[in-house]
Amino acid sequence: MARFNDDPAGGLGLILVERQHGYQTSDIEKMGLNSQSTAQVVFQDVRVPKTNMMVAPGEAMKALFISLAGSRPLVSLMALGVAQAALDESIRYAQDRSQFGKPIAGHQLISAKLGEMATKIEAGKLLALQALSQVDRGERSDVSAAMSKWFGTQMACEVVGEALQIHGGNGITKEYPVEYMYRAVRPFMVTEGTNEIQKLSIGRALTGIDAFG
C-alpha cells in the first residue's frame, strides 16, 4: 500500500513491488505469532512500473476493509485454537494434580473455572462463524468481523490466563505448555487492528458518529 497524494484515505493505492536494488528487509523478533515472519521493509530509490498498480489510488481502503472482514474472524479462531489447547491442558492437569486428598478438578473453584473457560471459547467460535457465514453469502460483515475479532481474542487471552492460574507455579515454568501459550495468544489482540479499534468500529456502526479522532 502506498500514498499517491495527501488525501488521508483517497490517496492510497496498492502496488506490486518486485525485489530489486534498493529493496531491503530486516527481521523483527516477536513474543508470539512466530509461524509468520515480521520484518521492516526499506525501499531506497526503487522504481515501480505503472503496470504493477494492483488497486488504483482511492480504492485501496475499500479493498483493505473487504480483506479485513474475512481475516479478522480467522484471527479470532486462531486465538481460540490456542485457548482450546490451554483448556485441554488444564483439564488434564486438573484431573491429575491432587490437593487435600483429591484431584483439583474436584474443587469448586477449579471446576467453575473450567466451565467458564469452555463457554467463552464456544461463544467466540460462534461469533466468528457468524461473521464468516456473512462473508460467504456476500453480505456486509465489517461489524460482525470487528465483534468477532475483539470478543474472540479477548476471551482467548482470558482463557489462557485462567489456564496458567490453574497450573499455579507450574504454569510459569517452561516445563508446561501453558507458559508458551500465554505468550502466543497475546499478540492476537493487536494484529489485524487492535481490539480498541474494533470497539470504535462497532460504536460508529451503532451511533453513526465517528469517534476515531
Language model features with spans:
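Short beta-strand-to-turn element immediately C-terminal to the catalytic PLP-Schiff-base lysine
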Residues: 1-3, 16-18, 42-44, 55, ...
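A short core secondary-structure module
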Residues: 1-26
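Active-site PLP-lysine loop of aminotransferase-like
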Residues: 4, 32-33, 72, 149
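Solvent-exposed alpha-helices and their adjacent loops that cap or buttress functional pockets
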Residues: 5-9, 16, 32-35, 56-57, ...
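Short coil/turn connectors at secondary-structure junctions
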Residues: 9-12, 37-38, 50
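Flexible, small-/acidic-enriched active-site or ligand-binding loops
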Residues: 18-47
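Alpha-helical interface subdomain recognition
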Residues: 40-42, 59, 66-213
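Long, acidic (Asp/Glu-rich), low-complexity accessory segments flanking structured domains
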Residues: 44-63
